[in-house]
Amino acid sequence: MKNKEIQEQRIKGYFLQATKDLLKSEGLQSVNVRNIADRAGYSYATLYNYFKDINDLVFLCVYDFYGECEQHVREHTKRQERGIKRLRASIRAYVDFFVQYPGIFSLFFMENLGSFKDKGRATEIISFSLDKVCEEEWNYCVSKGILQVEQVELIKSQIRHATLGLLMLYINQRVSFPYTELINRLYLQTNAILESCSPGGGRDGGGVSVHNSLISIKVK
């Protein structure tokens, strides 16, 4: 790689990191050309030498943030037993990532993406991010007969909507319960969905599960 190309990539990286830092700390409302340029240490005119507009930068941030979320989930679940246990752990790690970075959650799920040049691609990355970070375990559970292949898409959809709903309420402070209660409710919801759809109740052993949105009781 030539020196000019190396310098170009480095300057692009400064602008990208500056945008990511603003999104994480202050949200999309803080992202404008001058703020990005100030944080990157360059003039705002320089930004347009490397990017068409701010939307280009924000889309790259979406892609990078998804990669960070995926890495976070992988790092926090690699020691878990494969199957349902790692699937549950992956869902929790996904939630923990957004609790740690509420600005990213706001960008992903609360901002209008209508002006994005690559709106369709960005929407797909965002909307199915939970499914994707758990994809290996979904496939593993199907391959081992833990979950039935014809039900997996329904289970994914139910868990995705329940998880994002909880996060939306928690991050927007529409509920008063603490983080520990968030995780407790996450487990209850996840268990209820898995137990209602999987041949073995999503657990080892037999028995019949009785559950609703607040309780999950296994009757031997």
For each predicted feature, which ranges?
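Basic, helix-initiating cap at the start of DNA-binding domains
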Residues: 1-26, 30-35, 39
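N-terminal intrinsically disordered/low-complexity leader segments
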Residues: 1-10, 74, 201-220
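Short hydrophobic/aromatic patch on the recognition helix
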Residues: 40-51
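Short amphipathic alpha-helical segment with a characteristic S/N-K-E followed by hydrophobic residues
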Residues: 15, 30, 53-58, 69
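Amphipathic alpha-helical linker/stalk segments
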Residues: 61-87, 106-109, 119, 130-143
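Amphipathic C-terminal alpha-helical segment
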Residues: 96-100, 136, 140, 159-178, ...
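Amphipathic alpha-helical packing segments from all-alpha helical-bundle domains
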Residues: 74, 118-144, 153-157, 164, ...
